[in-house]
Amino acid sequence: TKQHAIAYRSWLLERLNPSTVKTQLAFLSGLWSVLCELRPDSTHVFRGLNKRIKVVKARKSDITITDPSQWEGAGDEMEIFQFLFFTGARLAEIAGLQAEDLLEDRILIRPNVLRPLKTSSSERSIPIHPRLKTLIVDLRKKNGLLWPAQYQESSKRWGVNLSKPCRKMLGITPKGFRDRAATVLRSNN
């Protein structure tokens, strides 16, 4: 009966997320519609039950990223994290950089033998942030790949093992740096 369907909806709402309840009720409503087609004399008990469920999307909390000058640590990981912070580039783009990609005033994001780009429009140049200049001077002295250890042969991907250390050390994922850069650019327009 309709009362049973309403009671079931209430029971689900006590135990599950409202959006999950809506999905389950929509599935049951579809099944009940088929039943009503096969037996025209039956009543559709699930029709309209979803209309009274309000789904409130939780707002993501704002992430505060500490300034790189306060980061603790050294080595390849921290160098890559600084590049991510100041460029907004993708992790694979930075992890697969070559010394030849570091010019005096900009960083070239371009495909190389081991690292294709995500899309054809990903090829670009990024101005060098003043706080990256000293690091770039040292890195420019290298030959070939800047961080060859970041390449994973089995998956043919760059920087795949950096997400967890980044989250653990800095409280943000590599993608979070890219999102932050986009937000900063939008707010400065």
What is the role of each PLM region?
Residues T1-S33, Q152-R157, G171-G176:
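N-terminal core-binding DNA-recognition domain of tyrosine site-specific recombinases/integrases
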Residues L12, F83-L84, V184-N188:
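Short alpha-helical segment immediately N-terminal to, or the first helix within
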Residues H129-I172, R180-A181:
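Active-site/catalytic core of tyrosine-dependent DNA strand-transfer enzymes
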